[in-house]
Amino acid sequence: LFRRMTVAQLAEQGDYRFFYATNRVPGGDASSLATRFGSEREADLKFGVFDTEIRPSLGLGMLIDPTEWFQNEEIRLKEVRSLEQQAFIEQLRGLVESSPHRGLLVVVHGFRERYPSALRKTAFLGHVLDINAPVLVFDWPGNQGSSLSGYRRAREVAHASGSELADTLHLVIREVQPDRLWLIANSMGGQVVADAVHELYREADLADAPVEIEHVVLTAPDVDKDEFNQQFKKEITALARHLTVYVSSNDRALLVSRLINRGTRRGESTLSPD
């Protein structure tokens, strides 16, 4: 199980190291993972690593029903440690250089994700993909509540967080310098990516140079379809070699989003699930 993923493996059997960058405002109690970061956004990026223990029983069922109990039981966060930016760069670069393709996977989660669950789901995704490269999660404060007003606040935060994701990608491209950079985003995380790409596209040295990102994958992106077609597709072509979009015909979050935003979302499928 997970035979390819050796770069991030630690000495202890079943333990793996992942990286994070977040634009959350630090919470009042750094000793507790649940309160280490809050649900507010700020422009300053914080960096770190987190070590996880993955139970051998972990299966694809978590994608279907990723309950808090299941995450806590099957994916245990053993240590979460903050790093200064330079130490973060050096550690991440070291793993990139030791990976077979000098690759790096960047993950952006979606609406309602809290800091601890974002870390656990990142570990889960890395193991399911079984990718032999380091994995970095860009964690943004999408947990603004389950109400309609909470959704609207989350969209505002997603748009604003594009700036910090752009800063993170810029740091990765310039300082870590992976040969292959992959970017995966889910749901409203797709909006964060769209806004980050818009910022990076305006940098001539990035937009006019050879592509910096190998592959961008968006799953059920909560992005306006017209915005996607008229702006994002053009801009991403200048930055990424490949783009894959997975759509859904029965994603309830996208259906609610369409009602709130009064427009079709790019992650919606026109095909009936029946």
Predicted regions and their residues:
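The conserved beta1-alpha1 loop
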Residues: 106-110, 220
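Short N-terminal helix/helix-N-cap motif within the alpha/beta-hydrolase-1
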Residues: 115-117
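Lipolytic serine-hydrolase domain surface
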Residues: 2-83, 89-99, 119, 123, ...
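Active-site micro-motifs of SAM-dependent methyltransferase domains
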Residues: 113, 190, 223
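Amphipathic, coiled-coil-like alpha-helical scaffolding segments used for oligomerization/assembly
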Residues: 100, 112-113, 184
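Gly/Ala-rich beta-loop-alpha elbow adjacent to hydrolase catalytic centers
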Residues: 165, 185-189, 193
